[in-house]
Amino acid sequence: MLPMNNCKVISEVITMADMFAPLVAQLKANPKTIVFTEGNDPRILEAASKLLAEGVLKVVMVGNEAECKAAAAAGGFDISAAEIIDPENYAGFDEMVHTMVELRKGKQTAEECTALLKKSNYFGTMLVKMGKADCLLGGATYSTADTIRPA
């Protein structure tokens, strides 16, 4: 048995919420934008709806708008404050292709980059690269390799 004379009783319990409170306050004061590359996955929709409800981050979902909204409705998730971007209809798509070709330094053609950017993992990565978002979360349906390969 250990001697008790050197022990202090801690009466305060620190919760995870307490630990993250300063970070949450900082994010609310200066919200960052996160891109979710799998915009119709129920796990992603749940996370996005929670972040939006808490006002912690601005949310961009990549995917077909109708499919994302239908999946959210089916799961009971409110993503009405999220921006949904469909690579097939993105106004800055040509600029994105041009930037990717330059970044790849001739290793891929414009046609190859166009095909890659229609995949949400590549598209989301380029949104971050081009300053349209601050960070990206993927991997719900993509493998780890497919999630990091575009970087």
PLM features: what roles do these ranges have?
Residues 4-138:
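Contiguous, glycine/small-aliphatic-enriched amphipathic segments in soluble metabolic enzymes
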